[in-house]
Amino acid sequence: MREKSYDVVIIGSGAGGGAVAKELAPLAAAGKRIAVLEWGPKLAESEYTGRELEMAKKLYVDSGGFITAERTMTLAFGRAYGGSTVVYTGTSLIIPRATIEKWRVPGLDWEDVARRSRAYMAENNVHLLDDEQLNENNRLFAAGCEKLGYRVEQFPINVKGCKGSSLCNLGCPNAAKQGTHRVQLPRAEAAGVEVVTNCKVERLGDRECIATVRNPGFGEPSAWEPGEYRVRAKAIVVAASAVGSPALLLRSRLPVRLPALGRYFTAHPALILVGEHPRPIRSFYGHPKSFYCDHFAASDGFLLETCMYFPFVTAKNLAGFGKEHSELMRRMNRMQMILVLALDPALPDNRVTVDRAGEPVVHYRFTPTVLRSLVASMRASARIFFAAGASRVHAPAADRFFIDAADAARVDELITLEHLKLGKLSITSAHLMGGCRMGAGPADSVTDAWGQVHGVPWLFVADSSLVPACAEINPYITIMALADRVAQRVRERAGELLAS
């Protein structure tokens, strides 16, 4: 086993790990040894082909189909230089004040999170897209919402030079998306931070990581030779995702008891819904996610967003199979799509564990409230589709494959909880949160408000697993803001932590 030694090791390079790497870059420039260990590959620009199955295999854990223990929801999260920011659509929102107040984390206040969020939005070139970049799918959603009186807003997006290829979720082929792979990581590397790709951290010991390097046969080879490594560090920052970070800590021999570790996992359970129009819809050009509707967030517990996915993902997310399924897929060029997100509660039994091999297992049970939110979201989406001119709608909790426009007034009657069958419809999630939640103490949390693991002064967490309860928005910028706080605490304690 080879040996390496650093002052700080950061595990993961996504929104959290990338932000920490950039914020600790001044320490590297001053001579401290800092490394980012990333499980995934760094692809060459020519490898961003936009081919759905190829890119899913290269950039996602389990090709985007990591399934829960109950087999009722699949989880999509990235594994790459840049983490999930490589495959994210770039929507960037500041978390609502009310959400932070509901979290009730001592030492965490909204003004601080908002200030840091605004700084990262500026750094990532977040802005509203011009009208010509808003494709027809997005325009139809906005028009339908406005016709019905539903509040609708445009998403700020983190792009520079967007060419409207609509391939955001497969990795931007035009180098336009300003994820950590484009912004924070290159700046960190320029200051002397080492980034080691294809490096999976298996477990932690006392101020050390045990890691394995394997090159997958695509992307750039790792900076380290393939093999096993013991990596010693004076401080370790874990930013391996809401699935990976709890699993890593559970595999490790920590010197403290943390009963909340892995628990309080939330996910914004999502459905991809489609309406068919009587004419082709120009939806595969322009940014795929330009508008959102939070009209029902407080009353019914869900958000609606525009989306446009690819043939395999779309086919997987339609309920049923056979003639009607094939008929709808043949008319994919007439589809309007809406993504619905349920705002789920943080429950101790929704959790990440590890199996006998140490691999993560996510346990997630849907509450009656979340199921009712999904039904309500399908009804609202059907109304938007019909208001926008759709001739028929496919809703997974209806008593039929298609609801025709003639029955538009009957959506409440046709889409019901009775017809929502878990395991018979495709529920997905890409907003994975919790498992190493922040809080006051070890009884019901894993870290303090600055990401330090309770009772372990050299160990920090800096990713979406910190989120103590549902973020109620797309959490990307919030993750960066929380990670920025973690980096600040490491810098402030550098004299103590990094003393030789």
Regions of interest found by a model, annotated:
Residues 164, 168, 205, 391-469, ...:
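A glycine-rich dinucleotide-binding beta-alpha-beta segment and adjacent secondary-structure elements
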Residues 81, 85-162, 365:
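Rossmann-like flavin
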Residues 129-137, 169-187, 196-198:
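Short beta-strand to alpha-helix junction loop
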Residues 156-157, 197-208, 212-217:
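A conserved short coil-to-beta-strand element within the FAD-binding core of flavoproteins
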Residues 8-36:
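N-terminal Rossmann-like FAD-binding beta1-loop-alpha1 element of flavoenzymes
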Residues 106, 258-383, 420-421, 429-434, ...:
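FAD cofactor-binding and catalytic pocket of flavoenzymes
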Residues 32, 39-95, 138-144:
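N-terminal FAD cofactor-binding segment of flavoenzymes
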Residues 23-28, 33, 40-45, 190, ...:
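Glycine-rich loop(s) and the adjacent beta-strand/alpha-helix scaffold that form part
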